[in-house]
Regions:
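TPR repeat positional signature
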Residues: 48-51, 68, 90-93, 110, ...
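Alpha-helical segment of the N-proximal tetratricopeptide repeat
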Residues: 38-77
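Low-complexity, proline/glycine-enriched flexible segments
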Residues: 1-44
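Amphipathic alpha-helical segments of tetratricopeptide repeats
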Residues: 72-77, 111-118, 134-135, 154-159
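Residue at a conserved register position within TPR or TPR-like alpha-solenoid repeats
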Residues: 55, 90, 97, 117, ...
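Helix N-cap/loop-to-helix boundary motif
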Residues: 80-84, 123-124, 164-171
Length: 192
């Protein structure tokens, strides 16, 4: 035979990539009602989150946005802004802002949540929120604003990539964002 099976290294099995960013949030919104999870005690935000999800599923994005903002305010006051459930709620609020056509707000909320997760040492969640911020950033059409937001995004993204974890394992996404920055710089130069 051409290859001796005893001396060849088997191909590593492909690594499962979890849903990240707004994809993960969308899966949660479209998934089961958090109040009805089998064997799991619903958290204190299960009821409000279920109502927000119902509004999103029904296409009532303005209602969902209002509910999310009020719930974030109330939950932050009760639990603290960096409590895990509040962070998940803020991820949901960012997704709703994106659906509502407010990519700048979605960007800022996602990046703030990414920073909180990084500070807590959760690189997977931090990178997921960087991905959400990147999705929102790509929806910003004004080149100068896109450059400003992109600088902020790439700063955190590069830091996460140098620290290892999922951001380091996905260099093509970061390279793609850097390429977009080049295109934005070219467009901004024409606009000025």
């Amino acid at each position: 035979p051409l290859l001796d099976p005893a001396t060849t290294t088997p191909e590593p099995s492909p690594k499962h990539t979890p849903a990240r960013g707004f994809d993960a949030v969308a899966e949660a919104v479209l998934g089961d009602d958090p109040r009805e999870a089998d064997g799991v005690e619903p958290g204190p935000l299960a009821g409000p989150v279920a109502r927000i999800n119902e509004a999103v599923r029904a296409g009532r994005i303005d209602t969902a946005a209002g509910l999310a903002e009020q719930t974030v305010t109330d939950a932050s006051a009760a639990l603290g802004a960096d409590h895990p459930e509040v962070l998940r709620l803020r991820e949901l609020a960012a997704y709703i802002a994106y659906l509502a056509g407010d990519p700048v707000r979605a960007f800022h909320v996602s990046l703030d949540v990414a920073r909180a997760h990084r500070h807590a040492g959760d690189t997977e969640a931090a990178y997921g929120n960087v991905q959400s911020a990147a999705t929102a950033w790509r929806a910003v059409r004004e080149p100068v604003q896109g450059l400003n937001l992109g600088n902020e995004l790439l700063g955190l993204w590069t830091t996460l990539a140098t620290e290892g974890g999922p951001a380091a394992e996905d260099p093509t996404a970061l390279d793609s964002a850097r390429s977009r920055m080049q295109r934005l710089a070219e467009r901004a130069a024409v606009v000025r």
